[in-house]
C-alpha cells in the first residue's frame, strides 16, 4: 500500500514552515526502500530538496496537487525544473480536493500549466509534439493509475 505525505506549506504543519521540509523524510525512505511513497504539493518552499529526494529514491513519486492554485507562475517554473531533473514517470496529478467543483477547477489549472510548459519545450525543440502528448497523458492519468494499481 502506498504512503501519501503532505509536504511544504500545505502539510498542516502547525504554522512551523520547517515542519514541511521533505528532507526530514530522508531516513524514512532509507529505512523502507520497498514502500512506495508519494509526496504532495511540490514541498513549497522546499522544492529543491523534494526534487533531490525524488531523483535519488526510486520509491518516491510526486503529486503536483495544489501547486497551480498557489501560483500559476511558480507552478510553471517548478514543473519546468522538474522536467530538467527527474523522469516524468515520477510525477502525477491527484487534485487533493474536498469537492467536485474544487477538483474540476484544480484539474483545469493543472492541465493549462502542463500544456504551457510542454508547449514551450516543443517550441524550443527539446521534445516533439508526440512526446509532449505522451508526457501529459502520463502525468494526468497513466502514472497515478500505475502507482495505485488502478490498471
Identify the function of each model-found stretch.
Residues 6, 41, 62, 96, ...:
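Divalent metal-coordination and catalytic microenvironments
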Residues 1, 33-36, 58-61, 87-91, ...:
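Short, well-ordered coil/turn segments that N-cap beta-strands
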Residues 41-87, 91:
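C-terminal structural cap/anchor segments
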Residues 88-89, 105-151:
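Mid-to-C-terminal alpha-helical segments outside catalytic/metal-binding sites
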Residues 30-33, 55-58, 83-87, 99, ...:
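Hydrophobic alpha-helix feature that most strongly marks membrane-spanning transmembrane helices
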Residues 38-42, 86-108:
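Short acidic/histidine-rich active-site segments
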Residues 1-49:
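Divalent metal-binding pocket/active-site signature
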Residues 13-22, 47-56, 72-80, 100-116:
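Histidine/acidic-residue-rich catalytic or RNA/ligand-binding cores of hydrolases
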Amino acid at each position: 500500500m502506498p504512503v501519501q505525505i503532505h509536504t511544504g506549506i500545505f502539510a498542516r504543519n502547525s504554522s512551523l514552515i520547517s515542519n514541511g521540509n521533505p528532507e526530514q523524510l530522508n531516513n524514512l525512505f532509507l529505512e523502507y526502500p520497498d514502500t512506495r511513497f508519494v509526496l504532495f504539493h511540490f514541498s513549497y518552499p522546499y522544492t529543491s530538496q523534494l526534487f533531490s529526494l525524488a531523483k535519488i529514491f526510486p520509491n518516491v513519486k510526486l503529486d503536483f496537487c495544489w501547486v497551480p492554485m498557489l501560483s500559476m507562475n511558480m507552478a510553471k517554473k517548478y514543473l519546468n525544473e522538474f522536467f530538467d531533473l527527474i523522469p516524468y514517470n515520477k510525477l502525477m496529478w491527484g487534485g487533493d480536493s474536498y469537492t467536485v467543483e474544487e477538483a474540476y477547477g484544480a484539474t483545469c489549472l493543472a492541465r493549462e500549466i502542463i500544456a504551457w510548459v510542454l508547449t514551450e519545450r516543443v517550441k524550443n525543440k527539446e521534445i516533439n509534439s508526440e512526446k509532449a502528448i505522451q508526457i501529459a497523458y502520463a502525468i494526468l492519468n497513466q502514472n497515478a493509475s500505475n502507482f495505485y494499481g488502478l490498471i
